[in-house]
């Protein structure tokens, strides 16, 4: 099968789908309705789906994974853009017959996986021969999707962790992503330092990727119409992350920094440490990182976060118990102790 696919990814004739029922007709034909619980919103205007696909770059001969194709509007645009191998991952059984119709219209080009993108092993979905070394140009593999709102944030966090670890879709190299998000989430992903929308998501995405806001789709373009507009965002993983620490450690530092958005950054950062040693260790970390404790979280640059992550990693290497510490767990134990009257054990058991 891979041989046929690789032959297809060489020099290919331009491909256009044959005449097909419109997306609206497919929805009627298979009695499809958007499910509110799955945050489904259909994009019926093929001019808009074509515009999304153009943001991914040249797809002629490319391998593509589409997330949540639904009735197949974006799928058609990807196929018409010349993708040689399109793998679609769809959780909702109702959409499979319509996608099979498309598969028959594009022989050998469309593969359908009935499954959940949050658990699907994309590293097994494409041939290893398409891989590129991380430091070189990105592989000819793209992830494209009109994401349901309820899955978009957990999914991009999961993919950012895969990116940091070079696993999943990024086992092939610096795989590019073109995805839709609620406009507010898109703004957070691309927000610059000191902007109102700057958040944990901004820092986590931007330390690993070049993140580009492409364009906004008005809510009225979707069926059913969501209450918000939608932003299209393109991600290209960086050859060298801007913070050279494990993803979980970076995420913990950034999450704590944004714990109190409107207060000085030290208020959230000190919660990285057990209460008994909090002032001492927080001061040591901020001093070592050369970060002004009175900056607001939104004012911290990627350089600040790099210095903070490095300083925190240094403290954890001196006292390994710090890495396991979570302030919410200490609060939970305190509540239990208040109820039962038991003496409080040290949390976590730390060195001197």
Label the predicted regions.
Residues 228-231, 235-237, 243-292, 297-304, ...:
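An accessory alpha-helical subdomain
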Residues 2-256, 307, 311, 319-325, ...:
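Catalytic cores of RNA-modifying enzymes
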């Amino acid at each position: 099968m891979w041989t046929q696919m690789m032959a297809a990814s060489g020099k290919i004739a331009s491909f256009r789908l044959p005449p097909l029922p419109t997306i609206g007709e497919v929805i009627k034909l298979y009695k499809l309705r958007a499910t509110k619980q799955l945050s489904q919103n259909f994009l019926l205007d093929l001019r808009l789906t074509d515009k999304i696909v153009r943001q991914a770059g040249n797809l002629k001969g490319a391998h593509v994974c589409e997330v949540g194709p639904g009735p197949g509007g974006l799928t058609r645009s990807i196929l018409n853009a010349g993708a040689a191998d399109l793998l679609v991952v769809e959780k909702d059984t109702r959409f499979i017959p319509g996608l099979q119709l498309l598969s028959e219209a594009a022989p050998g080009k469309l593969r359908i996986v009935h499954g959940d993108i949050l658990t699907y092993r994309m590293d097994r979905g494409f041939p290893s021969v398409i891989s590129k070394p991380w430091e070189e140009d990105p592989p000819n593999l793209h992830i494209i999707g009109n994401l349901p709102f309820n899955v978009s944030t957990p999914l991009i966090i999961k993919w950012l962790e895969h990116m940091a670890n070079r696993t999943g879709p990024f086992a092939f190299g610096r795989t590019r992503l073109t995805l839709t998000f609620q406009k507010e989430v898109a703004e957070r992903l691309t927000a610059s330092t000191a902007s109102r929308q700057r958040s944990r998501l901004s820092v986590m995405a931007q330390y690993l990727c070049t993140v580009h806001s492409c364009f906004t789709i008005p809510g009225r373009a979707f069926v059913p119409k969501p209450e918000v507009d939608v932003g299209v965002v393109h991600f290209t993983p960086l050859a060298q992350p801007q913070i050279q620490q494990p993803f979980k450690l970076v995420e913990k530092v950034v999450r704590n920094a944004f714990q109190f958005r409107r207060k000085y950054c030290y208020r959230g950062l000190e919660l990285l440490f057990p209460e008994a040693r909090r002032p001492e260790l927080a001061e040591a970390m901020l001093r070592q990182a050369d970060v002004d404790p009175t900056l607001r979280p939104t004012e911290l640059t990627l350089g600040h976060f790099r210095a903070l992550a490095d300083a925190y990693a240094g403290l954890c290497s001196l006292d390994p118990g710090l890495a396991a510490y979570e302030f919410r767990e200490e609060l939970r134990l305190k509540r239990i102790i208040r109820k039962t009257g038991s003496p409080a054990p040290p949390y976590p058991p730390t060195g001197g």
